[in-house]
Curated annotation (Swiss-Prot):
It is an enzyme of class 6 (ligase). InterPro entries: Aa-tRNA-synt_II, aa-tRNA-synth_II, aa-tRNA-synth_II/BPL/LPL, Asp-tRNA-ligase_1, Asp-tRNA-ligase_1_N, Asp/Asn-tRNA-synth_IIb, AspRS_core, GAD-like_sf. It is found in: Cytoplasm. One of its GO terms (biological process) is aspartyl-tRNA aminoacylation. It comes from the Bacteria. This is Aspartate--tRNA(Asp/Asn) ligase. Aspartyl-tRNA synthetase with relaxed tRNA specificity since it is able to aspartylate not only its cognate tRNA(Asp) but also tRNA(Asn). Reaction proceeds in two steps: L-aspartate is first activated by ATP to form Asp-AMP and then transferred to the acceptor end of tRNA(Asp/Asn). Its EC number is 6.1.1.23. It comes from Synechococcus sp. (strain JA-2-3B'a(2-13)).
């Protein structure tokens, strides 16, 4: 065996070197970020996760390291031992925390050279221009970049802040729940795992720890939390992954007010600890009905105005046939006021074929009527213009608070269609017209969701959140139209967390299962263990779960959760680094009693 190599221990990380260390001999380890040769003196930028420090190799002052310094290249892994010196004042670098010092490299050792051409530059602005597929293929290089390293460290600090708050200040207990569990009928598609020991039977990977955390409340754990891995086999978007992480919490003997208050303090603690931002409390609240009526969304971005205005009353008995028909059929008419929109938005974009027309029709709207507010008149299409009386024109201006130069865009039809189409249009135009202040932080709670929504394809009700959400006590007489004791936390138009009080009485849980179309036999087969647990003394309880990836993404100012996950999947649910998913050997399938029916091409 070769003799063991003894190297000096690291005394500092690269980004920690400061003027206080001047005159000290230090040993650092890291990667060569950049090499520069200035008049025979070689400067090396040494990088690790903490930052960058400048090394100096001088043929007179550091003759031992100088020859090797001329040979190293970007991304070589090296050890350096040297003396910390102050930089000449005219060479201070204010962009670096270490910018007032440099290290004269008295010893330099290459621990690992780069044997191949780098697929992309890890440092500098060039690194930001690399296609994402290449970055994901060489993720271990991508994660060396300052931005990505910063994101991973931010994620760590968020989790650290969560643990310290929940454990040290609130008495929560961290409990791991099973990854191999059983498939349930609600929610997205499950990832299934065949059981070799029990042929013909399957595990499912958990979409959330929902049932287990409720059982922990039955068990008397009282306050539970977990940084939980979850899995959903669904179509992917920029903010979705097949496997993701959530902060999962459950609490016994707390009402909704107590849960929201505790969670506001948690979020404020995270912002203060991680970003140094003090958030005002309490957070604003809107009911689901208010949010849909005013913003056309159950996760409204309240950083800007442009609230929807219901003008149905103005068109009662209207001679404009389109609106009259909508009202006769029980629909409504709303306006999206666009400040300054008269000049900024052309008729071409609003009429059939235009991009705004296409946007609203994508969500079920029949089209976009409009009014342009001019100094002395309202300008619109002929039929609508002819139907408006002076009193109606005045009432429209009063309701919308419109001023000359504004544009009024109409939505007419069923409430759900009008709200969603105008809500989407509101966000689109708010971004396009620069009405959304980028640095604003608006957090609010949405409460009183409906218990159920109708699934037209399956001709049945389904739980809007999940079937374990407790109905509002005032609505128990008619569960199908009941409000849920559910709440979502929305940050700048993005849902970052959601939870509810839970059902803890067997008879109510059975009624909810029946409402979503489960027979008593199906309910017992799928959830008999939960129903039985409710017979043994169950505390009132509730909880919440946060999408940790999404929360960190917003804190980091990123646009995709892939940029805050170490090894993410693509939007095709593939890992470009490892090649997963992949085919497996026939022997493995045989052991699992599984056969593939897939025929390529």
């Amino acid at each position: 065996m070769p003799a063991a190599i003894h190297r000096p221990a690291r005394t500092l990380y690269c980004g920690e070197v400061r003027p206080a260390h001047i005159g000290q001999t230090v040993t650092l380890y890291g990667w060569i970020d950049r090499r520069r040769d200035h008049g025979g003196v070689i400067f090396l930028d040494l990088r690790d996760r903490s930052g960058i420090v400048q090394l100096v190799a001088d043929p007179q002052k550091t003759p031992q390291s100088y020859p090797l310094a001329g040979e190293v290249r970007n991304e070589y892994v090296v050890r350096v031992t040297g003396t910390v010196q102050q930089r000449p004042p005219d060479s201070f670098n204010p962009r670096l925390a270490t910018g007032e010092v440099e290290i004269y490299a008295e010893q330099l050792e290459v621990l690992s050279p780069v044997g191949k051409q780098l697929p992309f530059s890890v440092s500098g602005e060039e690194a930001e221009e690399v296609r994402e597929e290449i970055r994901l293929r060489y993720r271990y290089l991508d994660l060396r970049r300052e931005r990505m390293s910063r994101n991973l460290q931010l994620r760590h600090r968020v989790i650290q802040a969560i643990r310290r708050f929940l454990e040290d200040e609130e008495g929560f207990v961290e409990v791991e729940t099973p990854i191999l569990t059983r498939s349930t009928p609600e929610g997205a598609r499950d990832y299934l795992v065949p059981s070799r020991v029990n042929p013909g039977e399957w595990f499912a990977l958990p979409q959330s720890p929902q049932l287990f955390k409720q059982l922990l409340m039955v068990a008397g754990v009282d306050r539970y939390y977990q940084i939980a891995r979850c899995f959903r086999d669904e179509d992917l978007r920029a903010d979705r992954q097949p496997e993701f992480t959530q902060l999962d919490m459950e609490m016994s003997f707390m009402d909704q007010e107590g849960i929201l208050e505790l969670n506001e303090r948690l979020i404020c603690h995270i912002f203060k600890t991680v970003k140094g931002i003090h958030l005002p409390r309490p957070f604003p609240r809107l009911t689901y009905a208010e949010a849909m009526a005013r913003y056309g969304s159950d996760k409204p971005d309240t950083r800007f105005g442009m609230e929807l205005v219901d003008v149905s009353e103005v068109f009662q008995g209207s001679r404009f046939k389109v609106f009259a028909k909508v009202l006769a059929e029980g629909g409504l008419i709303k306006i999206l006021p666009v400040p300054g929109g008269d000049e900024k938005i052309s008729n071409t974009r609003i009429k059939p074929g235009g991009d705004l027309f296409k946007l609203v029709t994508q969500y079920g709207a029949g089209g976009l009527a409009f009014i342009r507010v001019r100094p002395d008149s309202l300008d619109t299409i002929g039929a609508l213009k002819e139907s408006l009386s002076p009193e109606q024109e005045k009432r429209l201006l009063d309701l919308t608070q419109a001023k000359p130069g504004d544009l009024l865009l109409f939505g007419a039809g069923p409430a759900a269609v009008v709200n969603e189409s105008l809500g989407r249009l509101r966000l689109h135009l708010g971004q396009e017209l620069g009405l959304i202040p980028e640095n604003a932080l608006n957090l609010l709670w949405i409460t009183d969701f409906p218990m159920f929504e109708f699934n037209a394809e399956e001709n049945r009700l389904e739980a809007l959140h999940h079937p374990f959400t407790a109905p509002h006590p005032d609505d128990l007489a008619d569960l199908k139209t009941a409000r849920a004791q559910a709440y979502d936390l929305v940050w700048n138009g993005v849902e970052v967390g959601g939870g509810s009080l839970r059902i803890y009485q067997r008879e109510i849980q059975e009624q909810v299962f029946q409402a979503i179309g489960l027979t008593p036999e199906q309910a017992r087969d799928k959830f008999g263990f939960l129903l039985e647990a409710f017979e043994y003394g169950t505390p009132p309880h509730g909880g919440i779960a946060y999408g940790l990836d999404r929360l960190v993404m917003l804190l980091a100012g990123e646009d995709s959760i892939r940029d805050v996950i170490a090894f993410p999947k693509t939007q095709q649910a593939r890992c470009l680094l490892t090649g997963a998913p992949s085919s497996v050997e026939a022997k493995q399938l045989k052991e699992l009693h599984v056969a593939s029916t897939y025929q390529p091409g």
